[in-house]
Amino acid sequence: GLGDVYKRQVLESAITDTLETNYMPYAMSVIVSRAIPEIDGFKPSHRKLLYTMYKMGLLTGGRTKSANIVGQTMRLNPHGDQAIYETMVRLAKGNESLLHPFVDSKGNFGKVYSRDMAYAASRYTEAKLAPICAELFRDLDCDAVDFVDNYDNSMKEPSLLPTTFPNVLVSANQGIAVGMASQICGFNLGEVCDTTIALLKNPDHDVASTLLAPDFPTGGQIICDPAELRELYRTGRGGVKVRSRWRYDKQANLIEIYEIPYSTSIEAILDKVAELIKAGKISEISDMRDETDLSGLKLAIDLKR
């Protein structure tokens, strides 16, 4: 009967064998194909977008509509237009999420420090490659990197970009894969290049003496002991405390915050302060508002007289 059919189809397998044959290949495909940045500092989605823009002549030419770039990128990246456009937004100058943006943008690309400041649709914005991209593609035609087939074998794309500087350390990047996650802070471009040159000249060079601490696109102050920082980078575990930068306007009796930690947003700060005022933990503040405008970020805190 039917019960006998089911009994015959039950296969016994050791969990260790199943993990090795099923889970590990799946985890590796997510790590390699989607989530974790490669040694050039890019995830596949970033690399495909930038290479498409390079092939469109956007390194030397004028800007084109973002929607045009997104459409062309689909030949390399079989994702929806919104996913590709979000990748472009993060790489854009207007969004301010990178120390050295790769996309020279025109129009509203939102802000990394604002949850509510939405970016405009791709049909309204324009973009081209930023000048720094010349260093990403230098010697691309000189057999510097391997080329592989795209998803439908209709064209070739580079497996890596031949960056002339260690971009993986310059561009902040985070990725969540299966069984693995990476969170890489960005560093000052000049310090990274100086450290790289020093290491090439002397393999025993003390990296921490020239690469002092991470740099964040939104600014702020790092509150960390140098010895702790050294240990953090030796082990790869731990975190860095960052606080806002502010100034006091004596005449108006208010505090102006003009730089905030990279991992937070204006709205999250306003919500948290309001929560602390309601809980009675802060009593010196009479009002707090977002005065961010075209000149940059600004949070105003009115103090009680």
List the model feature ranges, each with a label:
Residues 1:
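Glycine-rich phosphate-binding loop
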